[in-house]
């Protein structure tokens, strides 16, 4: 996310945003993917929709839509106001135990799954969602949940 945003600035996230009039969550996810990272909606097969869940600190409701990018094509920053950079990370890197840890925001007791991939520190809701999708997809590997790392200032 762009450092110019008012919430979750500088954090790693998936494309997303509000649902426009006449859209459902899946249509909104595909539209936002196109607007933010130039993902062609026709290249994605929606695989699942998670239940709505409020995300701290704003507690805005988020409905994750998970898809299979069946026809990869070049993507990149589509909205410089919202997106600082775009990264694609192979599943093999995400499940590598060397890239997994437990993330903790200083001053808070709550932790989330974390990932150190492609020079990024992934944590919070995005870390939880990635970890959940890897588990549900049956590709998760055991990792050291006792390896607790503080969220760096640039990712808070």
Please state what every model-predicted region is.
Residues 11, 17-18, 125:
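Gly/Ser/Thr-rich helix-start
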């Amino acid at each position: 996310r762009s450092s110019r945003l008012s919430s979750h600035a500088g954090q790693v996230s998936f494309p997303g945003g509000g649902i426009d009039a006449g859209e459902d969550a899946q249509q909104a996810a595909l539209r936002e993917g196109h607007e933010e990272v130039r993902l062609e909606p026709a290249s994605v097969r929606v695989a699942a929709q998670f239940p709505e869940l409020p995300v701290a600190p704003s507690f805005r409701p988020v409905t994750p839509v998970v898809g299979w990018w069946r026809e990869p094509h070049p993507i990149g920053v589509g909205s410089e106001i919202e997106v600082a950079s775009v990264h694609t990370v192979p599943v093999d890197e995400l499940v590598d135990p060397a890239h997994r840890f437990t993330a903790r925001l200083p001053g808070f007791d709550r932790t989330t799954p974390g990932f150190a991939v492609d020079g990024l520190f992934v944590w919070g809701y995005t870390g939880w969602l990635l970890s959940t999708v890897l588990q549900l997809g049956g590709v998760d590997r055991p990792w050291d949940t006792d390896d607790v790392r503080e969220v760096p200032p640039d990712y808070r």
